[in-house]
Amino acid sequence: MLGDGNGGMCTIPGFNQIQFEGFCRFIDQGLTEELSKFPKIEDDTDQEIEFQLFVETYHLVEPLIKERDAVYELLTYSSELYISAGLIWKSSRDMQKQTIFIGNIPLMNSLGTSIVNGIYRIVINQILQSPGIYYRSELDHNGISVYTGTIISDWGGRLELEIDRKARIWARVSRKQKISILVLSSAMGSNLREILENVCYPEMFLSFLNEKEKKTIGSKENAILEFYQQFSCVGGDPVFSESLCKELHTKFFQQRCELGRIGRQNMNRRLNLDIPQHNTFLLPRDILAAADHLIGMKFGMGTLDDTNHLKNKRIRSVADLLQDQFGLALVRLESVVRRTICGAIRHKLIPTPHNLVTSTPLTTTYESFFGLHPLSQVLDRTNPLTQIVHGRKLSYLGPGGLTARTASFRMRDIHPSYYGRICPIDTSEGINVGLIGSLAIHARIGRGGSLESPFYEISERSNKGRMLYFSPSRDEYYMVAAGNSLALNRGIQEEQVVPARYRQEFLTLAWDQVHLRSIFPFQYFSIGASLIPFIEHNDANRALMSSNMQRQAVPLSQSERCIVGTGLERQASLDSGVTAIAEREGKIIYTNSDKIILSGSGDTLSIPLVMYQRSNKNTWMHQKPQVPRGKCIKKGQILADGAATVGGELALGKNVLVAYMPWEGYNFEDAVLISERLVYEDIYTSFHIRKYEMQTHVTSQGPERITNEIPHLEAHLLRNLDKNGIVMMGSWVEAGEILVGKLTPQMAEEESSYAPEERLLRAILGIQISTSKETCLKLPIGGRGRVIDVRWIQKRGGSSYNPETIRVYILQKREIKVGDKVAGRHGNKGIISKILPRQDMPYLQDGRPVDMVFNPLGVPSRMNVGQIFECSLGFAGDLLERHYRIAPFDERYEQEASRKLVFSELYEASKQTANPWVFEPEYPGKSRLFDGRTGDPFEQPVIIGKPYILKLIHQVDDKIHGRSSGHYARVTQQPLRGRAKQGGQRVGEMEVWALEGFGVAHLLQEMLTYKSDHIRARQGVLGTTILGGTIPKPEDAPESFRLLVRELRSLALELNHFLVSEKNFQINRKEA
């Protein structure tokens, strides 16, 4: 963010800036730090050869391919890392120095993402507990407070110090094992005299020192043996040795005692120590100071720590994650070099630096990181907003973090320190609620991984405030004015009493007592929440839903700007990278659908445009030129709009005419009634591109062939194939047709293996024995559309493990239909229930039929009244041909500011259009509507307006499914579950009750037997249906009951049923 000299203006930072800064920090600092840790490697036998890297000579090479080519050819967009290495012979002091290639590092593109194997991937920032010491108090089973101090290492390991009733201090190395703090300090190198000199309460340490502990801490070896015995839970008497010390160092001290730079700073600040920053390991002095503070806590001195406060958290950014992986790759490279040197000397070969180093460790480490690490995710590209929001996520999950199953409510809850740093609204729904957050707009990651937020410093001598960034540990000591104190007139501010924040409490103070103030109304919201107009009138749960649903909106074929917005639409569109921006000024000399040629500074620049590309959510990405030929443009001007942008502004939905009223029950329970105009005029029509892929392999019988000559297939299924056997571009394909013809070789069976009648049939019909089987790529159900692209990616090299890949892209045009999901920007969502003819829709007093009918009962109970303000203001803006950009919390200027704005605009629209029904004082914002079927007016006036409605990606074409036949589970013999497996619908316990309530016994029996798991009965249904007659009723038990009987038998329980005769009451036993 940039502040100017006027002291009141600032610019919003780039939304991708955090990703860029993290990657630059890794390239500038992280590489150097890890390379400097690479040790000098000596030969293990005679130590005559020494290998080392020269850190200052490393350099990265510009990639040989472009981003588009990397995506097209499924390659990684990376840079080669070179560094000078030296091989020194100690006997002769000769050194051989060479520049070697040690691997590829994936680069970050202009969107803040990386391209790995042709896929856009992004690294999520992680929130971890900051290393240091934290004191807390818990009640034991007797209701007595137990004080503990937890030391967290840089690796995430924990060492707990606790004090018992007798004021004895223990170090707990595991849940069951604990050891005296005197033994731990002695094992770390201190003797009893040093311990007593460095503590504030020596008498307490001496009070619980018995004879055994005196003997143990008398020597370091005895203390280490005692500690090893407790830590490793070994019996007997272990013998002190170097291997024992090495094992203890690796398993305990390295994991639980390495604090790192951040941990050392936190430890020094919390315990008032002055240990140098380069001492990153836990020292005996730290342990003793922590014990002193724990004793003080026991007697009421000191304060407990809030572990959920952001000052006790740190951000593990993309720089830290990439640096950790680079360090891991160098450790692997070290072991490779060491083995290679030993092998060369063993075989009496002369090694060179070039022969010792391989690029495999670095390349494979980063490939596995981007492909398998939980914090490396595939970039969600549903719409432009989704792309920028994805890179600003914060996760408590991942390695070293929390788990969704064990995280408590307190960890998920909003903390006051989130103000201006983490959005209190934007989070996931479901099991990850509160664990996946989003950065606030102005937040940045500072040194040490702390989240910083900007404030204006209020100075008594000058009206111009300085803009300062504060970490969570600093701003709690200042009086911070809340966001509603951003009045324009400073004179008004000085007279009023304003709400403020101080030490996580909310106070009311005079203006002259305030130290800091917020800089922006959106400062504490994320991007998604900042795009909701009138958000202050909505319940937070509905605002959360809206933030998530805006990321699910599909780009429409005809985008439209929102009438009522917040002003951040242009910034979101710009930073998403979906628009084409002029890199320099010049003149447009040629424009087309696929490129724009710009002339300036004596040369020409060709700017390629994105045409009908597929996102990973099957939505379309397309750029449309917005500048005519011959126009002079400036640097930074928009040349082409993206799939969901208009004029450089984000455009995710449509402004449609909406009425809030019931209509024959078709909008019951959030259902939505729409007009056929939305279908016929392509208002909510969207394009979706599906990808179908096939690979050719070399089998044991020979290579697979791509051909258009497929035997035993009907000709109309092959009509769209070209001479190579691949579907032609521009073809219209239906479900079941062949996209790629492929034959896989198979071993021909001998003639004698066939049955006699089959051999006779082959001889009569002249059928030859086939040596290959058909394995064509067929279009699945629901995939009909137009073929827009075919890619045949040839394999590089002759390896059979690197097959050829053929990809077919099919474009589908989807109008809105019954079953699709639509939503507003206030959490008001619904499913299309019916599409009415436009003449049957309710119409306004000027004859215009409405486009959508929402249920009015969905507003008061959900407390998202912001949709009513947007609805009415959008109607006024449509009549006045205006667009509004509303900042949130406008009541900071005056009471009822939102209502006054809406009513004033409606009144002006009523005057300018000479339509008094637009604003009627008796029921402002409402109007009398007429029934389109009868022409009669409705009894009550209805709220009408033009809100911004989105079409979401949850579409009925992707979800509707029916099963006529399919596979059955092997164990239960019931139909499989899921659309992808052609599964069936489960008739569960409550469904059976419902059918029983209606008395449909025969229907219920069919569902539980023929259509489910009665094997014998369902086999007889097909023949009976073909030949006619009644379907036989099943007599024995279905397979699921038989399975239950077998499972009970495995528990030694026998279950049988008996039939009792009515005549002689004899029991006839029958096996289950």
Curated annotation (Swiss-Prot):
GO terms for molecular function: DNA binding; DNA-directed RNA polymerase activity; ribonucleoside binding. CDD domains: RNA_pol_B_RPB2. Gene3D superfamilies: 2.40.50.100, 2.40.50.150, 3.90.1100.10, DNA-directed RNA polymerase, beta subunit, external 1 domain, DNA-directed RNA polymerase, subunit 2, domain 6, RNA polymerase alpha subunit dimerisation domain, RNA polymerase Rpb2, domain 2. The keyword Plastid applies. Its EC number is 2.7.7.6. DNA-dependent RNA polymerase catalyzes the transcription of DNA into RNA using the four ribonucleoside triphosphates as substrates. NCBIfam families: PRK00405.1. GO terms for biological process: DNA-templated transcription. The keyword GTP-binding does not apply. This is DNA-directed RNA polymerase subunit beta.
